[in-house]
Amino acid sequence: PSLTLGCGSWGGNSVSENVGVKHLINIKTVAERRENMLWFRTPEKVYFKKGCMPVALDELGTVMNKKKAFIVTDSFLYKNGYVAPIEEKLDEMGIQHTCFFEVAPDPTLQCAQKGVDQMRAFEPDTIIALGGGSAMDAAKIMWVMYEHPEANFEDMAMDFMDIRKRVFTFPKMGEKAYFVAIPTSSGTGSEVTPFAIITDAETGVKWPIADYALLPNMAIVDVDNMMTQPKGLTSASGIDVMTHAIEAYVSIMATDYTDGLAMKAVKMVFENLPSAYDNGANDPKAREEMANASCMAGMAF
């Protein structure tokens, strides 16, 4: 009990009798506070270590018996041979494949629509996103449009306080295609995040989409795809890793599980970004540590 100004208890402030001591002793009832269940979610499979990509992709044929793969990337990566090792591995396993390489920075809904038109004609059972955040974001949106043509982006982008308690129920993913994400820069962490941003070029509206249904099924973090990053990209993406890790650590939704990943990622950035910037491919260890830091910060984020 506590002595308070006013009278009455249980939230009341008026009585039909003379105010006495019993009315000043206001016994409050407080509801029991229960915290939400928390969870830590990542892609089902996360492969890492230099040279891991061919081994990881081997599962598509030997374990999953996939038949058709649709590769999403940008023109630079396609023209500079980054797609070739993937195509060679798919050919080796007898998996048919085609490639959409028209993704631009800040991908648009119109670009995604063009890609998904090709996707529907090809009817793949696997989608492979190769690139930075833009390519992976575009591929995630294409995945949604391929599996659920009726999807409404205005509904999917609806604000929410808790990703588990949103008004809009995100459609179930993975019934048509298995999603593989392969980063070529150590920065966005999109290969392990449930986020995608798409812009409507006609209206200028950006749709930020967030739902655990957008988590890739497999992430392949092979530093062989990141060795030749230019200095500008190395520095910018390295700071991106740092901001993801710090934001994850100070978030009100931070947990013991995310804190460990976030702090380790920060430590790895401080220890390896300068050398990755100065020495590039001449310091493969620093490159690999930055690739891992990016993925870990993405998990924490």
Model-flagged regions — what are they?
Residues 7, 25-35, 60, 64, ...:
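Structural signal for hydrophobic packing residues in well-ordered secondary-structure cores
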Residues 110-224:
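Glycine/threonine-rich beta-strand-loop-alpha-helix active-site module
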Residues 37-126:
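ATP/NTP phosphate-donor binding region
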Residues 2-4, 8, 22, 45, ...:
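Structural motif
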Residues 14-22, 46-50, 54, 63, ...:
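Electropositive phosphate-/nucleotide-binding environments in soluble metabolic enzymes
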Residues 1-37:
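C-terminal segments
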